[in-house]
């Protein structure tokens, strides 16, 4: 059975962050069943011009013969990402068919409209929501890929760094009977189900978060998610690096 490897929250900024990403890419390349990579946001930290081209060159050095899709996170510059990945091996798209399943990519990198959400929170903007509604009307049991969790999960401080319009998006998913969401942002492997929607969060490659600790923290626990797209549902296994 073919599989997908999800790589998230690389926070590329220094040599150590690239070394950790290398471990993830080598794991994906050596996984014989994997033919697709999902890069689920926070790829670069405070990105500047050419940073995504550097990531592209790094990925092409370690990954061959695999389809690669990317979305932006709150640390990314979505416009710069699209420009620097254009016509490359990393695809920034709104939807795709992967292993016979419809996959919808949702951009949550917009900043919240209110001032109550702390730095790191996100929002799906009005244009994105309108497009997502159109996609859902024409999709059959799609898989949704987004950076921020739609279902709040983890420690209280992580739940605060949330998606501003998460409640309305969850209601939309439930209305259209979407069963599976793939996300990042939480730097840990967490799975939760609410209103019939199961959300699968991947660990980061940069550093981990221990959600049992009541304040912001970092750990050395990094990894990727290995995802099986089955006929009706998906199955996720975490590979710790």
Where are these regions (language model features)?
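Charged helix-capping and loop-helix junction motifs
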Residues: 19-22, 51-56, 88-89, 124-127, ...
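Divalent metal-coordination and catalytic microenvironments
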Residues: 9, 28, 37, 42, ...
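Glycine/small-residue-rich loop that forms an oxyanion/phosphate-binding "nest" at active or ligand-binding sites
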Residues: 69-70, 78-94
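Active-site-proximal beta-strand elements of phosphoester/diester hydrolases
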Residues: 2-11, 100-112, 143-145, 197-204, ...
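His/acidic metal-ligating clusters that form di-metal
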Residues: 27-36, 67, 118-200, 234-235
């Amino acid at each position: 059975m073919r599989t997908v490897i999800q790589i998230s929250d690389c926070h590329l900024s220094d040599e150590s962050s690239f070394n950790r990403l290398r471990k993830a890419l080598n794991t994906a390349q050596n996984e014989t069943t994997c033919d697709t990579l999902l890069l689920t946001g926070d790829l670069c930290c405070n990105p500047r011009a050419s940073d995504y081209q550097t990531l592209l060159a790094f990925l092409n050095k370690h990954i061959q013969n695999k389809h690669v899709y990317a979305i932006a996170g709150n640390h990314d510059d979505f416009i710069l990402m699209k420009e620097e990945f254009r016509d490359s091996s990393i695809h920034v798209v709104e939807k795709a068919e992967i292993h016979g399943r419809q996959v919808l990519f949702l951009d949550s990198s917009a900043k919240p409209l209110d001032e109550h959400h702390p730095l790191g929170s996100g929002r799906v903007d009005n244009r994105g929501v309108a497009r997502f509604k159109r996609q859902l009307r024409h999709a059959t049991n799609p898989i949704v890929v987004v950076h921020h969790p739609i279902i709040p999960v983890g420690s209280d401080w992580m739940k605060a760094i949330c998606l501003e319009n998460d409640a309305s998006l969850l209601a939309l998913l439930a209305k259209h009977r979407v069963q599976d969401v793939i996300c990042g942002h939480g730097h840990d492997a967490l799975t939760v189900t609410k209103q019939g929607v199961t959300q699968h969060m991947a660990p980061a490659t940069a550093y981990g978060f221990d959600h049992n600790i009541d304040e912001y923290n970092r750990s050395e626990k990094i990894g990727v998610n290995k995802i099986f797209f089955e006929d009706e549902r998906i199955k996720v296994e975490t590979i710790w690096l």
